Curated annotation (Swiss-Prot):
Pfam family, one: Herpes_UL95
UniProt-recorded name of the protein: Gene 34 protein
Alphabetical list of InterPro entries matching this protein: Herpes_UL95 (IPR004280)
The family this protein is said to belong to: Belongs to the herpesviridae UL95 family.
Lineage of the organism: Viruses, Duplodnaviria, Heunggongvirae, Peploviricota, Herviviricetes
Gene: 34
């Protein structure tokens, strides 16, 4: 048989070696991927490598997983970490649930926002202490002496507006009380949640403060305040952040947001009940980037609100 290889390479050993390597590669491809490559020998002792440019469509989502396959033993740590970011685990129900989005509105009823404007919180404190005196409300609660914690939250040095241009201060010559979430003005709704959040807020505000309060205004033994702060340093509580602004300054920021049309706040204050009469005509709408819902951002007449609250301030 006439050797076409010897004729083609003209005795060049390098070309002959490259031809042999190419032939070996073609044979390996045709054996490993028979559906796409085929090697054909021609009558002249040469070879053709034929490729199927349209391989068979074997997409995995078009196939069904066999019931006998068991993937329970697979260990995917990276996937588990990513899953924890998107979901929360409820140990009580032993089920996985999606994390709830932060609500766009923070609604205060008449009693709550009026109390938020008052510096004197004695009635709230007495109401909470009276409920905590009932043993059934002490299940799972840490603080043995809750009064110092509650007193620090409402009367401590850092429990007032930190704004250098505090509107409350310009009107009454004293910084406004720091705005808290609505449920903190209604301990009767859930006293356990109330005292739990009191401890979180006090720890965040006063853990590193040596003199958290003016001891002259404390109507009980001053040692109880110091002991309460020291106790909080020994326990691990969830981090709870506050805005350090009073209600008037928070509403002013919301008004500025509405006037610019930006709406860059995470939760918009809504004054319920009698607060509806303070809403102005300067209202904007914006689309939430998380939920896609259309949100309405109200603005309030702060001057009128201050005029109506002036009598309540004088009564304190």
């Amino acid at each position: 048989m006439f050797n076409l290889v010897e004729l083609a390479v003209k005795g060049n050993p390098e070309l002959k070696k490259r031809y042999s390597q190419g032939l070996d590669l073609a044979i390996a491809m045709s054996e490993n991927i028979p559906d796409q490559f085929k090697l054909i020998e021609t009558p002249t002792n040469s070879f053709l490598l034929i490729s199927n440019v349209m391989p068979e469509d074997s997409r995995p989502w078009h196939t069904q997983i066999q019931k006998c396959l068991d993937f329970s033993n697979l260990h995917l740590p990276k996937l588990n970490k990513l899953n924890k970011i998107c979901t929360g685990y409820d140990h009580r129900e032993d089920t996985v649930k999606k994390l709830e989005a932060v609500p766009p509105y923070l609604v205060y009823d008449s009693e709550e926002w009026k109390l938020a404007l008052q510096i004197n919180k004695d009635s709230l404190i007495y109401s909470a202490i009276e409920m905590l005196a009932d043993p059934k409300n002490w299940q799972g609660l840490y603080p043995i002496d809750p009064l110092p914690y509650i007193w620090l939250l409402f009367y401590g040095k850092k429990s007032f507006c930190a704004s250098s241009d505090c509107i409350y201060f310009k009107k009454y010559n004293v910084p406004g009380p720091m705005l808290l979430p609505p449920h903190m003005y209604r301990p009767d709704k859930n006293i356990s949640s109330f005292i739990s959040h009191v401890c979180q807020y006090v720890k965040n505000l006063y853990e590193e403060v040596s003199e958290p309060i003016n001891l002259e205004i404390v109507p009980f033994d001053n040692c109880r305040i110091k002991e309460a702060v020291e106790e909080l340093k020994q326990i691990d509580l969830p981090v709870a952040y506050l805005s350090n602004l009073c209600l008037l300054c928070t509403l002013h920021r919301q008004n500025m947001s509405a006037s610019r049309g930006s709406g860059d706040m995470c939760g918009y204050i809504v004054l319920g009940g009698e607060g509806e009469k303070y809403i102005t005509t300067n209202i904007i709408s914006k689309r939430c980037t998380v939920s896609g819902d259309c949100l309405i951002v109200p603005s309030y007449n702060i001057s009128l609100l201050m005029q109506n609250m002036e009598i309540n301030y004088e009564q304190q």
